[in-house]
């Protein structure tokens, strides 16, 4: 599927305001522009910023000859409890604020201009014991494809063994057909698929991904007129009486627990800021990162791959002190929202 970034053309305003929103470029941290007061409900945990709810808007234009194509919106991170509206209809609700999610646009689109609105909540203070930011703080993109295409997230790569070096590449498609796969240094292979096919590949003289040398391979998958490109490292992980092992070798974890904010940029997920963060940690002697206290961005995971830094993904931790935050607890768990 083809990814089109939707980073420009947005406006943002407080939910309920009647004045036009101000133009913003994504990723955008709306909380960063709010006043800081001693009476802020979040207090020291959120830097004394006040909390508000926000409404983002932009136009999504779809040519008539592409209306029958697949259109899927991806939001990499919206803080929090996002509502997505297309042409006045509620297309999705996403509780939590740190996981990416997808919205199938098919039932709501029309040829020509479409009104896209996203509501992000943050007035329910206090809702965090760290600076969360607010709004569309990670990238948004539109995935499109014709009838025959590789499914979104339809390429999965797994290291089976190191001696011999074998990887398993699983490809899922929207229809039967021929799948072509190319991995650098290996001959091109093709297989007929009924919608899902597996390519077991042996890599001679494989270059392993290690904490000293982050060797990465590039995999290109083609199906009909569609294409997907993924990178992967040859590595195995384990845990036993000798502790953590990587590629069968014991590794002493020298890790840091880092939050998703980027200092003066607030919660904005800027690729250069993320790269700088990982680079500085590696230069200081760290070899691992744990995302605190929630799933991190795709940008951070990719940078860890490039910088030979192991990564541990936190799922969720909420609360404003040592006790669970009743607002988030009720929304996510009692209400069955999940994460």
Please report, for each region that a protein language model flagged, where it lies by residue.
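Accessory beta-strand-rich segments of carbohydrate-active enzymes
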Residues: 3-16, 30, 46, 51-150, ...
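Hydrophobic residues in beta-strands and at strand termini
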Residues: 6, 26, 60-62, 75, ...
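Short strand-coil-strand connectors
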Residues: 15, 76, 87, 182-186, ...
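Active-site-adjacent substrate/metal-binding segments within catalytic domains
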Residues: 35-62, 66-74, 79-85, 92-95, ...
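Extended acidic/polar, glycine-enriched regions
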Residues: 109-111, 170-240
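Short acidic/polar inter-strand loop motif in beta-rich domains
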Residues: 121-128, 224-227, 248
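Contiguous beta-strand segments within globular domains
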Residues: 159-170
């Amino acid at each position: 599927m083809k990814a089109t970034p939707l980073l420009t053309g947005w406006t943002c305003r407080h939910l309920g305001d009647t004045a036009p929103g101000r133009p913003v470029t994504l990723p955008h941290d709306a909380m960063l522009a709010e006043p800081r007061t001693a009476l802020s409900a979040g207090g020291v945990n959120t830097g004394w910023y006040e909390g508000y709810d926000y409404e983002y808007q932009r136009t999504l234009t779809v040519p008539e000859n592409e209306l029958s194509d697949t259109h899927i919106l991806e939001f990499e991170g919206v803080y929090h409890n996002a509502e997505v509206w297309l042409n006045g209809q509620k297309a999705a609700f996403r509780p939590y604020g740190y996981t990416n999610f997808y919205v199938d646009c098919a039932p709501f689109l029309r040829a020509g201009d479409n009104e896209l609105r996203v509501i992000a909540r943050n007035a329910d203070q206090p809702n965090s014991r760290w600076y969360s930011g607010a709004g569309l703080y990670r990238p948004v993109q539109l995935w499109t494809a014709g009838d025959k295409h590789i499914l979104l997230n339809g390429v999965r790569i797994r290291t089976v063994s190191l001696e011999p070096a074998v990887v398993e590449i699983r490809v899922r498609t929207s229809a039967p057909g021929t799948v072509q796969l190319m991995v650098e240094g290996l001959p091109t292979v093709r297989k007929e698929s009924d919608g899902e096919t597996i390519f077991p590949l042996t890599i001679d003289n494989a270059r392993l991904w290690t904490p000293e040398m982050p060797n990465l391979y590039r995999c290109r998958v083609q199906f009909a007129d569609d294409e997907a490109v993924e990178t992967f490292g040859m590595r195995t992980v384990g845990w036993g009486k000798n502790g953590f092992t990587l590629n069968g070798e014991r590794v002493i974890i020298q890790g840091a627990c880092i939050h998703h904010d980027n200092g003066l940029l607030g919660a904005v997920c800027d690729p250069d800021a993320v790269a700088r963060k990982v680079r500085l940690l590696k230069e200081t002697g760290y070899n691992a990162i744990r995302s605190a206290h929630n799933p991190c961005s795709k940008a951070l995971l990719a940078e860890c791959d490039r910088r030979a830094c192991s990564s541990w993904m936190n799922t969720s931790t909420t609360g404003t002190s040592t006790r669970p935050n009743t607002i988030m607890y009720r929304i996510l768990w009692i209400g069955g929202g999940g994460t």
